[in-house]
Regions:
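Amphipathic alpha-helical polymerization modules
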Residues: 1-135
Length: 135
């Protein structure tokens, strides 16, 4: 019986993973001009790493393996009047490309929608199967 719900578990865990990915992308976009962070220096772009898991035949899905910080160096902009300017007058800004982030957001949204569609189709198919057993 549990095997019948495996597709729902895979889609449900994928929905959660894509939600975390969308939140991470939104944070990247929101911090595009953040010149300071709690860690020191400018905000660092973050990216979500996924992994599939198979604990046993009845427990499969998608996990977030880790959230990594982008290793690209910050952008330097000459602005000696900025409070975060270094001794040479340069301010370090996050190396975030908003177009790249928007493309990633669209991709994550499509993946989220695909999993919602899969859940709806599976739910409909399961309801029709139950209806057939009632005849």
């Amino acid at each position: 019986m549990e095997e019948m719900f495996l597709p729902l578990n895979v889609s449900a865990t994928a929905l959660e993973a894509q939600k975390i990915r969308m939140n991470t992308i939104a944070s990247n976009i929101a911090n595009v001009n953040s010149t300071s962070s709690p860690e020191g220096g400018p905000y660092r772009r973050k990216d979500v790493m996924f992994e599939s898991y198979l604990y046993d035949e009845s427990n499969v899905g998608v996990n977030i393996s880790k959230i990594v910080e982008d290793e690209r160096p910050p952008k330097k902009v000459y602005d000696p009047s900025h409070p975060d300017a270094d001794k040479d007058g340069y301010v370090s800004y996050p190396n975030i490309n908003t177009i790249e982030e928007m493309v990633n957001l669209i991709d994550a949204t499509h993946a989220y929608e695909a999993n919602l569609t899969l859940i709806a189709v599976y739910k409909d198919m399961f309801a029709k199967t139950l209806a057939l057993t009632q005849i």
